[in-house]
């Protein structure tokens, strides 16, 4: 009974983060994790691997929320997207923005928790990545090759 209620509450959140569709997350995380194993040192510390995976999930979720905020009205009219949580009013816009800012804050904390040696560079790169992440969804309207912007966003995961 309690799990059923919890599922009803969490389902739209997982959907807006696209955590119910892991393909995009895997495509993002594989290069980021490869970069950890390609460093000249020994195997990476598993705490760092964990932080990169969690940070990647948070940032990709943040990007998906930004996409749904940008496209809310369009998504309602498209068969493939009309059941997304914002388009179908399962989640309201205030909650979506709150979740976006929560993920942004948690991602910032994860970046601050990275080893001191590369922390400030990672933080700098994270701040450089943020505008790209937030404008990518709108780029489908004004840029002929929005996938280029998406690849820049995902490339930051390797650099960080």
Task: Give the location of each predicted region.
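Interhelical loop and helix-boundary elements at the membrane-water interface
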Residues: 2-27, 73-99, 134-152
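Alpha-helical transmembrane segments in multi-pass membrane proteins
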Residues: 31, 35, 51, 55-59, ...
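Structural signal for membrane-spanning alpha-helices in multi-pass inner-membrane proteins
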Residues: 32-39, 107-115, 133-137, 157-160
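Functional transmembrane core segments of multi-pass inner-membrane proteins
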Residues: 37-51, 121-129, 133, 148-160
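Transmembrane helix-loop junctions in multipass membrane proteins, especially transporters and channels
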Residues: 40-44, 72, 112-120, 138-145
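Membrane-interfacial loop-to-helix junctions in multi-pass inner-membrane proteins
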Residues: 41-54, 90-97, 144
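Multi-pass membrane catalytic core of lipid/isoprenoid biosynthesis enzymes
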Residues: 54, 72-126
């Amino acid at each position: 009974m309690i799990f059923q209620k919890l599922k009803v509450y969490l389902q739209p959140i997982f959907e807006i983060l696209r955590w119910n569709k892991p393909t995009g997350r895997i495509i993002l995380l594989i290069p980021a994790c490869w970069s950890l194993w390609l460093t000249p040192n020994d195997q990476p510390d598993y705490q760092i691997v964990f932080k990169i995976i969690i940070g990647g999930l948070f940032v990709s979720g943040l990007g998906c929320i930004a996409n749904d905020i940008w496209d809310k009205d369009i998504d309602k009219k498209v068969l493939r997207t009309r059941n997304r949580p914002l388009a179908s009013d399962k989640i309201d816009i205030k909650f979506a923005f709150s979740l976006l800012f929560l993920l942004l804050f948690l991602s910032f904390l994860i970046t601050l928790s990275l080893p001191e040696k590369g922390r400030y560079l990672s933080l700098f790169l994270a701040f450089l990545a943020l505008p790209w992440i937030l404008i990518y969804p709108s780029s489908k309207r004004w840029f002929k090759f929005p996938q280029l912007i998406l690849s820049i966003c995902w490339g930051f995961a390797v650099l960080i």
